[in-house]
Amino acid sequence: TSGLIAFPRL
């Protein structure tokens, strides 16, 4: 899963 793509501004 790519969480960074869903929330790149974390």
Swiss-Prot record:
InterPro entries: Periviscerokinin. Keywords: Amidation, Neuropeptide, Secreted. Disulfide bonds: none annotated. It is found in: Secreted. GO terms for biological process: neuropeptide signaling pathway. The modification Leucine amide is found at residue 10. The keyword Phosphoprotein does not apply. Pfam families: Periviscerokin. The keyword Secreted applies. It comes from the Eukaryota. GO terms for cellular component: extracellular region. Its main location: secreted. Mediates visceral muscle contractile activity (myotropic activity). Belongs to the periviscerokinin family. This is Periviscerokinin-2. It comes from Polyspilota aeruginosa.
